[in-house]
């Protein structure tokens, strides 16, 4: 069994909804903006190589993965559980449109952790995305894995080229990244927030 896996997780490129600060979640099938696609393509060579490619099923992640990893894309492994948070009745709306909505204000006042009407709570998101991440680890190990921890977490930005070959690249969402890393590496949920096209590199140590 391989004891250490190197993984990079990348947030998809920017969408129109991101620009308008909307809650773009699990239900949305937005594509990248033309400008975002051009930026990702321009920086393609600065993203590290990987042996396997995993993605969320969301179209914006598929778009991004195809631009960064064109040679791996046809063999990509789609993991449904790595999709973004289900924002329920908040989906597609922004703060300005909901600032006087009692249900939205209650959710925000609770630290954005509670159950969203028609959607998920943060705990539900964390549970789902951790299940998806475990699928990634087990696919890499080719067997059931009963324990692992995440170490050596470093932020990745595509402005600096890296030469490391990773065991896996995951193209997913801001919520997915914050959920998985805050649960496995510790720290505040929002401390793992990244801009579109950025992400984190880390090591998975298998026990």
What are the functions of these language-model segments?
Residues 187-207:
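Domain-level recognition of soluble alpha/beta enzyme cores
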Residues 6-10, 166-172:
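Beta-strand elements within well-structured catalytic alpha/beta cores of enzymes
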Residues 68-130:
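Phosphate-handling substructures
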């Amino acid at each position: 069994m391989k004891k250490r896996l190197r993984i990079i997780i990348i947030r998809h490129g920017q969408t129109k909804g991101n620009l308008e600060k909307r809650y773009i979640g699990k239900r949305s099938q937005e594509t990248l903006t033309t400008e975002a696609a051009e930026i990702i393509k321009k920086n393609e060579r600065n993203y590290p190589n990987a042996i396997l490619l995993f993605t969320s099923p969301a179209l914006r992640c598929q778009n991004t993965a195809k631009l960064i990893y064109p040679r791996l894309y046809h063999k990509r492994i789609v993991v449904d559980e790595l999709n973004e948070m289900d924002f329920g009745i908040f989906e597609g709306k922004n703060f300005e449109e909901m600032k006087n909505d009692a249900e939205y204000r209650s959710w925000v006042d609770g630290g954005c952790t509670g159950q969203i009407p028609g959607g998920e709570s943060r705990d539900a998101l964390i549970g789902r995305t951790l299940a998806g991440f475990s699928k990634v680890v087990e696919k890499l190990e080719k067997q059931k894995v009963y324990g692992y921890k995440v170490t050596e977490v470093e932020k990745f930005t595509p402005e600096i080229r890296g030469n490391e070959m990773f065991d896996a690249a995951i193209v997913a969402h801001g919520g997915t990244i914050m959920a998985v890393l805050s649960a496995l590496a510790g720290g505040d949920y929002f401390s793992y927030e990244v801009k579109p096209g950025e992400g984190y590199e880390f090591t998975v140590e298998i026990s």
